Amino acid sequence: THQLKDIIKQRVYLIISGYEDLNDHDILRDDRLYQTLIGKDQALASSSTISRLERDVSVTNNIKNQSIFVNTFINSYKKAPDSIILDFDPTDFTLYGNQESRSYHGYYRDYCYLPLIVTCGSHILAAYLRPSNIDGAKHVWAILSLLVKHIKKSWPDTKITFRADSGLCRHKILNWCERNSIDYI
């Protein structure tokens, strides 16, 4: 069996190397370079294993996958920082075909997705693909609360600030921030 983090590393490394098709994984799973990058001395995941992972994107699995970003961020520090700023940014991702959940967005004047990207400095903490026919603030509160909970487990005394543009200004989000001592900009 293969650990989730190793499968994700494998997928990312091969995409970065220009091998975005799943069938490339069957050829390169025995490649010593990729095995070394991932820290394995055995065959990496097959295309069918990766395909099952990509198709099994339940909310629970998505949260587990996203936690890799947060753990990497936390582990990049030798000691807890005094304060951090979580930047929430819904952005357009233009579509050029008939992809699933494709919608026209009047503001962007195009067919697009509206992914939500959360960063802290140069670290990506969450990347959540969403259709564009939704309120840009959809799921922001849920993602913010999960991130704060995860970060506070490791850094209970770190001051957290939520930063976003006015498109994410919702009473539910701001009231939650105030109740949980999270500053917001």
Language-model regions, residue ranges each:
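Short acidic, glycine/serine/threonine-rich loops at helix termini
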Residues: 37-38, 95-101, 125-130, 171-176
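DNA-recognition alpha helix
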Residues: 22-37
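Electropositive, glycine- and tryptophan-enriched low-complexity nucleic-acid-binding patches
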Residues: 106-155
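Short, conserved catalytic/metal-binding motifs centered on acidic residues
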Residues: 10-11, 22-25, 46, 50, ...
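Domain-level cores of phosphate- or acyl-group-handling catalytic modules
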Residues: 134-185
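Active-site-proximal, Lys/Arg-enriched surface segment
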Residues: 42, 47-116
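Short, amphipathic alpha-helical "recognition" segments used to contact nucleic acids or chromatin
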Residues: 8-16
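Basic, short loop/linker segments at the boundary and entry of helix-turn-helix/winged-helix-like folds
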Residues: 1-9, 138
